[in-house]
Amino acid sequence: MKQYLDLMKHILAEGVDKSDRTGTGTRSVFGYQMRFDLSKGFPLVSTKKCHMRSIIHELLWFLKGETNVAYLRENKVSIWDEWADDNGDLGPVYGAQWRSWPTQSGDAIDQISQVIAQIKSQPDSRRLIVSAWNVGELDKMALAPCHAFFQFYVADGKLSCQLYQRSCDVFLGLPFNIASYALLTMMVAQQCDLALGDFVWTGGDTHLYSNHMEQTALQLSREPMPLPTMTILRKPESIFDYQFDDFELTNYAPHPHIKAPVAV
């Protein structure tokens, strides 16, 4: 994951110091892109240990269309707890927008089902898009979508995906985001009988929090390890039928975990 370390170096060298919503302060750049060939390994950061179990459960939670943290808590995943209300609700965040985007007529659009059907029937379409950025519901969300918009692309029998992330916590959040969307691309490719292409990550306000600088320096002192392999052990009938045990990560030999505070 040299690309990830290069981004950190770029922010430190070229970034500007900015204030932010959380009051923590950041060093930030605007507009950055990374590309990962998914046929060459699974893009999981190795210069610190990443919690793949949380990444998988969060993605399955999104795909269920759920917006209450009960499922996550049942599976010992606490990454959304800081934003949940007393009942565990987050408002109409990612899962709601992916699976039940509300229309003016009172209906709902299942964007995930829709985009998979489009990939199968119209692979050359330039409208293979899923958006979580619903302007009409932002004020109801506990946290506005950071990874806001993604697009699929089919060429030469391979599926690629590009994510636009309007705001990115590079130290804590980005390793999760890259792995999550790489895994989603693998799942969609399997459902559509396509080979793996690239995952392209595009960042808007791409930042390191001021209280992550020591952790960033430690991570930059470490050598990245070879990419691990992610295997999907079965092909269920639907994108919504995957279970945690369907995924097997092998040859992941990361450096030790690095703890850092979350900016809420």
Swiss-Prot record:
Q: Which family does it belong to?
A: Belongs to the thymidylate synthase family. Bacterial-type ThyA subfamily.
* SUPFAM superfamilies the UniProt entry points to: Thymidylate synthase/dCMP hydroxymethylase
The gene from which this protein is expressed is thyA
Keyword Transmembrane listed: no
Q: Where is it localised? A: Cytoplasm
| Residues annotated as catalytic | C146 (nucleophile)
Subunit-structure text:
Homodimer.
- Tell me which UniProt keywords the record has, alphabetically: Cytoplasm, Methyltransferase, Nucleotide biosynthesis, Transferase
Q: Which domain of life does this protein belong to?
A: Bacteria
Can you list the GO cellular component terms from the UniProt entry?
Answer: cytosol
**Which top class of enzyme applies to this chain?**
transferase
Q: Where does (6R)-5,10-methylene-5,6,7,8-tetrahydrofolate bind?
A: H51, D169, A263
Which Pfam families does the UniProt entry name for this protein? Thymidylat_synt
Q: Which terms does the record give in the GO molecular function aspect?
A: thymidylate synthase activity
Keyword check for Cell cycle, yes or no. Answer: no
Where does this protein come from, organism-wise?
Shewanella baltica (strain OS223)
Name of the molecule in the record:
Thymidylate synthase
